[in-house]
C-alpha cells in the first residue's frame, strides 16, 4: 500500500470543517482591514530565498527542497528551483516584478497556502505545512515606515485569534534595530561569543563568525544558558529605532493589546528590521509559536526592487488548528436534512426536493430509493441530519411530506412549499404572513 510521504498528511473530515471555518473567518478579518488576496507559485528560483531569507538561516542552509530544472539542465544557465519554505520573499518578488510600487500607495496583501521545509517531522511540524500570512508594503510616501502599521498589523492579529476562538495566547515583542545600529550589536555579539563559542553547538560556532545574530535563534537546550549571558540588542538601538519601538508599544497599550518584551527574540529570517513579534500558546508544547512576523524595510532593495518598507507575518495554520482542537475537540458534522426516497420512481422527486432546499441555503443529503425506511433512518443519523424528509409515493401524490426531527422524534406532515421554512426554523409553521421563497413554489 502506498502511503502519504513522511512529513505530509491527509486532512480529512471532520477536521477539514474546522480548517474551512478558520479560513473563512480569516478572510473576513482580512477584508475588514482592507487586505486583498495574492497567489504566488509554490516554487521559485532558489536565489530568491538565498538573497531574501539569508544563506545563514536554518531555512536556507538546511531545510529547503531544491532541485535543478531538468528542462534547462543542458543549457549554460541551468536554474535551481526551490519549493517555497515561506512566502514573504515570493510576495515581495511579485511586488517588484509587477511594479506594484507605481501605484504610490500601500499594498495590503494576504495569502493562504502550503509551504515546504525539510524539517524533522514532529508534533505540529510537517514538511508540507500551511501558512496564513499577510504583508503591508509600499514606497516611503505611503506611510509604510510608520510604527502605526506595525501596531495595526499586531492588533489585527489579536482580533483574528479572538474571532477564530483561540484564547490564552501570549504576544512577545522586540526590536532588532536596522542597518544603522545593528552592525555595532553584531560586533558586540561576535566579541562576546569569541570566548564561549567553543562550548556551543557546531552551528553556533560557525554563525559566531558569519552571522552572530543567528546564534540567538539556536534551539539547542545546552546552549541557552550561554545565550542568556550575551548582550541585548535593546542596549544598542539608535534613537530612531528606540522611538519607533516605543511608538509601537504605546499604540498597543492604547488599544489594549497585552504584550511582553523579549529582548532575545530575533526571529529566524535575516530580512527583519526593527519590530519583530510572536504569538505563542501553551497547548503547543516546547515550540509554542502559533505565528510570527516583523518589519522588513530593506527586503525589496535586497531583491533589486525599489525602496519599499514593509511588515508582515505568517500563521502556522496546522499549529493554530491544533491549538483550537486542544481547547475544544471537533464537533460532529451535521446537516439540516436527509431526504429519503421510498418506492419506485421517487428518486427524481427526492432530488427535486433536495435542489429546492439547497437553493435556500440548507445542507441536505439525498438518500437512495433502494433503502427501506429503517435503513434510511440509520443513514440519516450517520449523516448527522437534524431532520429526515420521507419522500414516498403517497407523499408525492399528496404533495405533503412526513418530516421527522431525529433528536426529539417529533413528526409532522409538511406541504412541499413549506419544507424549507419548516426545517430552517426548527419545526415552526408559517402563520400566513410570510412570503414563500421563490424556490419553494
Swiss-Prot record:
Subcellular location as annotated: Cytoplasm
UniProt keyword annotations, A-Z: Aminoacyl-tRNA synthetase, ATP-binding, Cytoplasm, Ligase, Nucleotide-binding, Protein biosynthesis
Entry GO terms, CC: cytoplasm
Domain of life, source organism: Bacteria
Family of the protein in this entry: Belongs to the class-II aminoacyl-tRNA synthetase family.
Entries under NCBIfam families matching the protein: hisS
The protein's name: Histidine--tRNA ligase
Source organism per UniProt: Koribacter versatilis (strain Ellin345)
Gene for this chain: hisS
Amino acid at each position: 500500500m502506498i502511503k502519504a510521504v513522511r512529513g505530509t498528511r491527509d486532512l480529512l473530515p471532520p477536521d477539514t470543517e474546522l480548517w474551512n471555518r478558520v479560513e473563512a473567518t480569516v478572510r473576513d478579518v482580512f477584508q475588514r482591514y482592507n487586505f486583498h488576496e495574492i497567489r504566488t507559485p509554490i516554487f521559485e528560483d532558489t536565489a530568491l530565498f538565498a538573497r531574501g531569507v539569508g544563506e545563514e538561516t536554518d531555512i536556507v542552509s538546511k531545510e529547503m527542497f531544491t532541485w535543478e530544472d531538468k528542462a534547462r539542465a543542458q543549457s549554460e544557465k541551468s536554474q535551481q528551483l526551490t519549493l517555497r519554505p515561506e512566502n514573504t520573499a515570493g510576495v515581495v518578488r511579485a511586488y517588484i516584478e509587477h511594479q506594484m510600487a507605481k501605484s504610490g500607495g500601500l499594498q495590503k496583501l494576504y495569502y493562504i497556502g502550503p509551504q515546504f521545509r525539510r524539517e524533522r517531522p514532529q508534533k505540529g511540524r510537517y514538511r508540507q505545512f500551511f501558512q496564513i500570512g499577510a504583508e503591508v508594503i509600499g514606497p516611503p510616501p505611503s506611510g509604510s515606515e510608520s510604527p502605526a502599521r506595525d501596531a495595526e498589523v499586531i492588533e489585527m492579529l489579536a482580533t483574528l485569534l479572538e474571532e477564530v476562538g483561540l484564547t490564552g495566547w501570549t504576544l512577545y515583542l522586540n526590536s532588532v534595530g536596522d542597518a544603522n545600529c545593528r552592525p555595532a550589536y553584531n560586533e558586540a555579539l561576535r566579541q562576546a561569543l569569541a570566548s564561549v563559542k567553543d562550548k556551543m553547538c557546531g552551528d553556533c560556532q560557525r554563525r559566531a563568525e558569519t552571522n552572530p545574530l543567528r546564534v540567538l535563534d539556536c534551539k539547542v537546550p545546552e546552549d541557552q544558558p550561554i545565550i542568556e549571558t550575551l548582550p541585548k540588542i535593546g542596549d544598542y538601538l539608535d534613537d530612531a529605532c528606540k522611538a519607533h519601538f516605543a511608538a509601537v508599544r504605546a499604540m498597543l497599550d492604547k488599544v489594549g493589546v497585552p504584550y511582553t518584551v523579549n529582548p532575545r527574540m530575533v526571529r529566524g529570517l535575516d530580512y527583519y528590521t526593527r519590530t519583530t513579534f510572536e504569538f505563542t500558546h501553551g497547548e503547543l508544547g516546547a515550540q509554542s509559536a502559533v505565528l510570527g512576523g516583523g518589519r522588513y524595510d530593506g527586503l525589496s532593495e535586497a531583491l533589486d526592487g525599489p525602496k519599499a518598507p514593509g511588515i508582515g507575518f505568517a500563521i502556522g495554520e496546522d499549529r493554530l488548528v491544533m491549538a483550537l482542537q486542544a481547547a475544544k475537540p471537533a464537533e460532529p458534522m451535521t446537516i439540516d436534512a436527509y431526504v429519503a426516497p421510498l418506492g419506485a420512481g421517487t428518486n427524481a422527486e427526492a432530488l427535486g426536493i433536495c435542489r429546492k432546499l439547497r437553493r435556500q441555503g440548507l445542507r441536505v443529503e439525498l438518500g437512495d430509493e433502494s433503502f427501506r425506511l429503517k435503513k434510511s433512518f440509520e443513514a440519516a443519523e450517520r449523516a448527522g441530519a437534524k431532520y429526515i424528509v420521507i419522500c414516498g409515493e403517497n407523499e408525492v401524490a399528496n404533495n405533503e411530506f412526513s418530516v421527522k426531527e431525529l433528536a426529539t422524534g417529533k413528526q409532522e406532515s409538511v406541504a412541499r412549499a413549506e419544507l424549507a421554512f419548516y426545517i430552517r426554523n426548527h419545526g415552526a409553521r408559517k402563520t400566513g404572513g410570510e412570503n414563500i421563497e421563490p424556490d419553494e413554489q
